[in-house]
Each structure stands twice: as structure tokens, then as C-alpha cells.
Amino acid sequence: MQTKQDGRLGTEKIGKLMLELALPSVLAQIVNVLYNIVDRIYIGRIPDVGSLALTGVGVTFPIITIISSFAGFASGGGAPLAAIALGQKNRERAERILGSSTSLLLFFSVLLMAFFFVFQTPLLYLFGASDNTIGYASTYISIYLVGTVFVELAVGLNTFISCQGHARTAMCSVLIGAVVNIGLDPVFIFVLHMGVSGAALATVLSQALSAAWVLRFLTSKKSGIRLSPRTMKPDFAILGSVMALGISPFIMSATESAITIVMNHGLQTYGGDLYVGSMTILQSVLQLIFVPVNGFTNGVQPIISYNFGAGQFDRVRQTIRRMIAITFTAAFVYVVFAMLRPALFAGLFTTDPKLIAIVVKVLPVYIAGMAIFGLQSGVQSSFLGLGQAKISLFIALLRKVILLIPLALILPHFFGVMGVYYAEPIADVCSVVTAVTLFLCNIRKILSKEALAKVTHTEA
């Protein structure tokens, strides 16, 4: 049975669909990144200890990123495959993909929470904590870990709502958590004097509400594919396909942790706590654009997957062209503005003149390559939407594992602390050129009945 909601993905005008599906996703991600940014702004302004508290929370990002990465492991593979199945009018398979992915998320939740509770202290030191910042880092992450299952379900299952074309519902799940977090942060941090503990508690409560919203929808009659105990029995053939496709977004996200570890270690070795703090600000500046860009590509991806599954390749081409043009333009304009106004962004997060001076110096260097990175964002999302696991995996590995991490380890030996910052733009430019080349060389072959048959055969 085909619902009106998912059927329109193959019939309505592409421009209208992109606006209707991507706009809610973008708005949701903007609010989502704002609550993360506001979190850091509040922490950075805690009286007397703001800079150290901000640095301490910053070194927990690898753990937080890894937790979110495992959610993307299930959803990044499961949602595109579910959308392709919907395009083929195979709702039963789409529901089995949803159920198996949910079981995988629950398994990840237990595993991750147990692991990080046991090893958090040595890991935090490895990630760049010092004796001055370990207390703030440990306090924050201990509370955050309690809500691991909420993060996995809220992040991991929301894409199964958007892949059906329910963009506004998916947006609401993010907005609920974001608004609650923004509202609770100042109350817990300043009014109740809970400091870093308050920031973590606000995050856990907000994620719990988001998870409840997502589960309520996916188990209701409003959802085109419904989650039920019957479909949650793991289907290992499906899980194999989900993980094969999901490994690319997983590596893209999880390797951010490895990058943060390597960079924080280099910054701590060659600079000190303030340089580690600068990386927290730099990553926040990039999030302000690339989280919304990812929201846009996530919103558009169901159009690509559905029409690919339906064999409507002309609609796929039109969607991809428009998506890449928009992601490139948005990223280019924002990055150039940030390069010209580094003090404006630094001042959002700290009043410490020494930290501001560092950010003003390094921000234009660090984000320079991101001016063209919108091209890769569009290309990467296209490959994922088309079920191209191997190419997506290679692109993810190239930028972060093959290029960025080795450069961040090698360049500081020649350029000191600035070598850590130089690594990013070099890796970005090389990666974008490679991704675009692969796209141009492979897209015609991918948009064929033969390629579609291979994708659906491995999943069946």
C-alpha cells in the first residue's frame, strides 16, 4: 500500500518538494545547533571559571560525537534503504528495516553507556583534558551518559520520519528538544547554580522528550511505516545492508572524534589549555553552517532515494543538481563572512582577551578550505541516497583518516601549534576535488536499472 504522503515524492514538482521537505529540516537543525552553541556560550560565561569549564566540556565532544555516530550508523543506512523500498512500493520491507534498525540502536545504547562509564577518565585525558579541566569534563559526561538511549533513539529514528516525507514532524522532534534545552540551560546553570552539571542535565531531559516524540509518531497510525515488536526482531540480512551503507556516515561522524583527539593533543602539547579552548570555538563556528547544510541534504535525500527506487532517474538528476548548487553557495557565503569577521564569532563564546586573540588569528586559516566544502556535502549525500556504500565510505575515509589525521600529526613538527590548524584546509581542498571527480565519473553508471537492481538485491 502506498500512502499519499510518500507517493508525492515521485510526482510533485522537485522545487516544491525540496522546499517543503528541506526547509523544516534546515530550521530544525538551525535550532538544534543554536542550542548546542547557546550551551557553550552559557558555560563560557560561568563566573571565574568560564574558560576552563568551556575547555573541559570541549574535551567531552569526542565521546558525544561517537554516541551520535552510532545513531547515524543505523539511521544513515536504514533510512535511505527504507525510502528506496517505499519507492518500490514494498512497505513490508521498509518496516523490517525500521524495526531492525531500532533494535540495533538499543544494542548500541547499552554498549556505549557501559564502555564510557568504565573508561571515561583515561579517555578524557587522552582527548586533551588537563588537571585543570578534568573535573568539568568528568562532571558533564557522567550526567550525559545517563541519557545515551535517548540520544540514540531521538537521533537515530528521526530520519525514518523524514524519509517518509513527514518533514514537519521530524522538525518538531528536534525543536522540542532544542527549545527545552535552551530554556533549562540558564535556569540550571545560573539560577540553581548547578554550573556544568546543569548544562548536562538540561541536555539529557531535552533528548528524552525528543525520543518520546519520535517513538510516539512511529508507533502511531500517522506513520506510513510503523514500529512494532514484530518488526523489531533483528533481521541479520537487513542489518548487514543497513550497516554496509551506514558505515559511511558513521565514519564521517565518528572520525570527528579521532580528529578532535589528535588536534586537542597537538594543541595541548604545543599551545596549552587556551588553544584547546580555541578548537571548541572553531568547531562551533563550523557547526553554525554545516549542521544546517546537513539538515538540507537530509531533507532532500528522501526525494533522491524514492525516485531512484522508482526508476525515475531524470527526477534524481534534477534534485541532485539543485541540491549541490544550494549547498555550495550557502557554505561559500558563510565561510567567507566568518573569515572576514573572526572577532565577532570569538566574542560570542568568551570574554577572555587571550582566547579571543587566538581565535582571531587561527579562524581564517582553519576554515578556509570549507569555502568549497558544500560541494562535497552535496556529493556525499547523493551517493548515500543512491545506496552507494563503497564510494561514500571511501570519501569519508579520504578526508579524515587518510588526509586530516596524518597532517595534524605531522605538520606541528614543522610549524608548531599552527600546523594543527593548517591541516584542516589542506585536507578539505584535496577531499573536495576527489569527491567531485568521483561523482562526475560515476553518476551516469549509477543512475541505471542495473545499478538499482544491485542495491535492492543486496538488501533483499
Residue ranges of each PLM-predicted region?
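Helix-terminus/linker motif at the lipid-water interface of multi-pass membrane proteins
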Residues: 30, 34-55, 124-131, 187-194, ...
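Short runs within selected transmembrane alpha-helices of multi-pass transporters and secretion channels
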Residues: 75, 144-162, 170-178, 199-212, ...
